[in-house]
């Protein structure tokens, strides 16, 4: 259940975009095909998406939003404060969820054990069972196509939906623009 979804984020030149599929599974059963796993945070200045347990993810969203408020929307400071709290709390360390958070300047993956990872290229991140398919497609499309950020995320998630049985093609997208 921890990885059964796909979230892809792309921080381009003109937009920051996050997208996710809508499939919710329990074991080998599809429970829902149109779930929303992405949202905006802190005055619509931060994009976030989750993979993993829905209940755990909502708790993490609430906690992270508290850190964003305390840090006045500073994404880097919020991520560091959130990670410190996550690692110190025994209950949090057992939560089965991962998050991607981004704004127009930075992008981070928050792992299930409290690690913070900034993608090597600083532009593309993915989580979930179809994450490797989506990020591979996104990197190829970024390098060899003229798709804008939103189209690139959608097309990459559609490709992941063709390959990953835990990912569908009911794609939702959120973006931040200049």
Curated annotation (Swiss-Prot):
Keyword list, A-Z: Allosteric enzyme, Cytoplasm, Hydrolase, Metal-binding, Protease, Sodium, Stress response, Threonine protease
Enzyme class: hydrolase
Function comment: Protease subunit of a proteasome-like degradation complex believed to be a general protein degrading machinery.
Keyword Protease: yes
Organism domain of life: Bacteria
Active site residues per record: 5
E.C. number(s) listed in UniProt: 3.4.25.2
GO CC entries: HslUV protease complex; proteasome core complex
CDD domains named in the record: protease_HslV
Catalyzed reaction equations: ATP-dependent cleavage of peptide bonds with broad specificity
Signal peptide: none
Gene3D superfamilies: Glutamine Phosphoribosylpyrophosphate, subunit 1, domain 1
Family: Belongs to the peptidase T1B family. HslV subfamily.
Positions that bind Na(+): 161, 164, 167
MF terms in GO: metal ion binding; threonine-type endopeptidase activity
Compartments in which it is found: Cytoplasm
Regulation: Allosterically activated by HslU binding.
The name this protein goes by in its record: ATP-dependent protease subunit HslV
Subunit structure and binding partners: A double ring-shaped homohexamer of HslV is capped on each side by a ring-shaped HslU homohexamer. The assembly of the HslU/HslV complex is dependent on binding of ATP.
Gene Ontology process terms (BP): proteolysis involved in protein catabolic process
Transmembrane segment boundaries: none
């Amino acid at each position: 259940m921890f990885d059964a979804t796909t979230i892809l984020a792309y921080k381009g030149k003109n937009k920051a975009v996050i997208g996710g599929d809508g499939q919710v599974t329990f074991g080998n059963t599809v429970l829902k095909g149109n779930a929303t796993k992405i949202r905006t945070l802190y005055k619509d200045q931060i994009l976030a998406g989750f993979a993993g347990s829905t209940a755990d993810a909502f708790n993490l969203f609430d906690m992270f939003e508290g850190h964003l408020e305390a840090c006045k929307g500073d994404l880097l400071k919020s991520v560091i404060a959130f990670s410190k709290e996550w690692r110190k709390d025994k209950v949090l360390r057992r939560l089965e969820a991962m998050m991607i958070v981004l704004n127009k300047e930075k992008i981070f993956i928050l792992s299930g054990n409290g690690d913070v990872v900034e993608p090597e290229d600083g532009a593309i991140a993915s989580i979930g069972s179809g994450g490797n398919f989506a990020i591979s497609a996104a990197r190829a499309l970024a390098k060899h196509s003229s798709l804008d950020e939103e189209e690139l995320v959608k097309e990459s998630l559609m490709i992941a939906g063709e390959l990953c049985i835990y990912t569908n093609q009911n794609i939702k997208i959120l973006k931040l623009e200049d």
